[in-house]
Each structure stands twice: as C-alpha cells, then as structure tokens.
Amino acid sequence: MNALTLPDVAAQAARQALPLEWVGMCGIALPVFIEGQRLAAKADAGVSLDDGDARGIHMSRLYLGLEAMEQQNLSPALLRQVLQRFLDSHEDLSEAAYLNIHIDLLLRRPALVSPLAGWKNYPVTVSAQLKNKVFHVELKIDVAYSSTCPCSAALARQLIQQQFVDDFANKPLQHADVLAWLGSTQGIVATPHSQRSTAQLHLHLDEFVDELPLTSIINDAEAALGTAVQTAVKRADEQAFALANGQNLMFCEDAARRLNLALRGSPGISQFHVRVIHAESLHAHDAVAESHWRREQP
C-alpha cells in the first residue's frame, strides 16, 4: 500500500485575497529565565500575513521557534533572535513578527525593620516586535502599594483635635494624662481610610538596552511611592508601615506625578505611560490617574 502525502491545507490559496495584520497563537505555556529564575510563562506569538493570496501561516513553526527561550536568559537580544526565526520560517508570507511574554516575576523583599523577608509577585508582560527590520521592546509591570487619603487624614486629625478640646477643656494638662490619652481609642477617635493600590507601568525601552531592567524599574517605582505592600512582617514592621503611610499621604494624582518624575530618571526608557488605580475604601468606585512622558529627540 502506497503511503499518502499528508495534505497541507494552509498552503492552499485563500478564497478571499486579503492580507492580515496578525495571525498566531495566544496562551502558549513555556518556561523562561529571568534574572536567574526559571519562571512559568504564557506566550502570544504571531506574524503578519502580508501575502493576501496565502490561506494561512505555519503555526507549528512559531511554536518551535519559541524553543530558544527555554535555556537562555530573557533579553532583548534573545527576543530579536526568536522574532527573526518567526520571519525566516515565513519567508514570502510575513514582514512583521510579534511576541508577548506574560509572567509573574518573584522578588524576595525584606521587611522594613525586622530581619524577615518574603516573596512578592509582580505581573509582567514583555512585548517585542520586529517589523520592517525595526526591533522594538515594551514592558508592562504592575506594582502594588498602599495609599492613604490626605483629605481623610486631615478630617481625622480635626476630629482628634475636637476630642482633645472636649476631654481637656478647663483642665490642667498633665504630661502623663496627655500621653495616655494619645495612646487610647478615646483620644484617637478617627483614622484615615487607606486602600491597596496599583501602579500600571507601560514602558518603551531604548534600542541599545542589553538587559530587561525589570527589577530596577520596580525598585524606582516603589521608592518613589514609599508605601510598597509588604510580605512577612512583625509588629515593628507594621508600625513602620503605618509611619510610611502617614508620611506619604497620596491622592491618585500625587502617585502618578511621583512615578512620572521617578521613571524619567530610570535608564533605558524612551517613553512611558503610567496609570494608577486607588481602589477606594470610602467609595464603591476607583480613583484613577494617568500620566505620559516621552524623551525629546536631540
């Protein structure tokens, strides 16, 4: 019995001749190495279908092209190599290649005061494209932090002042009595509302960047905000966190401005878009602010 040739339907001519901007696969599971860590990732891989007469692309070739990422540290050079493989395997079909890598970056973070430390998760997307021989990389990073409302803090202070007047009016002030009052719920009758907040960073990298500056960008963002969420803590750390929140009262507008100024000084960034989301505990809606920056060309 003669062996039959397997049909290749994708090689047939399209019934409607029309180019497509993007064709590929989303949610491909694969391991990647970032800063020495082997992490589980999901990849979106695709190419343009510029030959409108071709019915489809060769998706298996894209899948195999991702194998180069299994043993090497994720870098702009590796991303470009993979994208070039996509194009080489689709010669005469595609002029542009695209790749998104979705990961949860794990960084070990120390406590504020005690010797404790713990792992913290940062959702990251690394996006790369090679189009008309022009290579480009973008990063999306989510950074969680705490925000305490300045207005709520002022209102709480006013209530405490009023309670002080009510409790000590026409009384001689004794240091011990005032100290005890300040440490009691009778004295501190109100506290400002705080909420867990998120900074969504979308950054365009310079062409000359050799490494993905994930950790340095996260460090710059957290330093600018001053209230990064914590991992393992003792009471001393929780107290230090309360102090940090009190010293860094922030509307969403304040957070967006802090991040804008901080990221301008981060090396390797040509432009960025910042979106901060304060999941209000006072309201059932979020407070949101956005900011853009683009380096001026010399």
From Swiss-Prot:
- Pfam families from the entry? GCHY-1
Cited InterPro entries: GTP_cyclohydrolase_FolE2, GTP_cyclohydrolase_FolE2/MptA
Give the Enzyme Commission number: 3.5.4.16
Which GO molecular function annotations are given, in alphabetical order?
GTP cyclohydrolase I activity
Q: Is this entry keyworded Kinase? A: no
Question: Which domain of life does the protein's organism represent?
Answer: Bacteria
Protein family per UniProt: Belongs to the GTP cyclohydrolase IV family.
Cited function: Converts GTP to 7,8-dihydroneopterin triphosphate.
Name of the protein this chain belongs to: GTP cyclohydrolase FolE2
Q: Which organism is it from?
A: Pseudomonas fluorescens (strain Pf0-1)
Where is the organism placed in the taxonomic lineage, from the top? Bacteria, Pseudomonadati, Pseudomonadota, Gammaproteobacteria, Pseudomonadales
